[in-house]
Design a protein with these regions (language model features):
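Hydrophobic alpha-helical membrane-anchor/signal-helix detector
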Residues: 34-69, 79-137
Length: 154
């Protein structure tokens, strides 16, 4: 009987260690974030099940910093995202509207060409600047989620 005790004790340790490892993996699997885009809306999902924890629609950014509060690096990137996302959308929308006005003005006879050129220049400038802000925002979103997932307990 005394020889069997260490074997049983070792087997129990192996089984308990495997259960602890499975619990850690499932904790990561349940809390990791990912991003999906559905019908023009950005969604931030948590875990394998894909629970939606934040949405970003047109002119409506998600509050990402609240989701990634556990990681300081993720919060810093989330603030960059929040600072650039909404202004980028508004400025790009202004550029699209100005482009429409420029095209409309070009169809009207006897319009001063300076007006047309000004509208086109303004629209391209706004589209470029807004697109750059959105590009920075999406890069920061990617980094924030990466930092958050990296710092999760495994």
């Amino acid at each position: 009987m005394s020889r069997l005790t260490p074997v049983l004790f070792g087997a129990q340790l192996l089984i308990m260690g495997a259960n602890a490892m499975a619990a850690q993996v499932s904790a990561y699997d349940e809390n990791a974030l990912r991003v999906e885009s559905r019908q023009g809306n950005l969604q931030i999902l948590r875990g394998i099940e894909g629970t939606v924890v934040a949405r970003a629609g047109i002119f409506h950014p998600p509050r990402l910093a609240n989701l990634v509060i556990q990681s300081d690096s993720a919060v810093a990137e989330a603030k960059i995202f929040e600072r650039n996302y909404e202004p980028g959308q508004w400025i790009a929308a202004l550029g699209i509207a100005t482009l429409g006005a420029a095209i409309g003005a070009s169809r009207i006879p006897d319009v001063n060409p300076v007006i047309q050129v000004s509208l086109y220049a303004t629209s391209f400038g706004a589209l470029g600047y807004g697109g750059n802000r959105l590009h920075s925002a999406y890069g920061a979103l990617s980094k924030a989620i990466w930092w958050y997932n990296r710092d999760l307990k495994r």
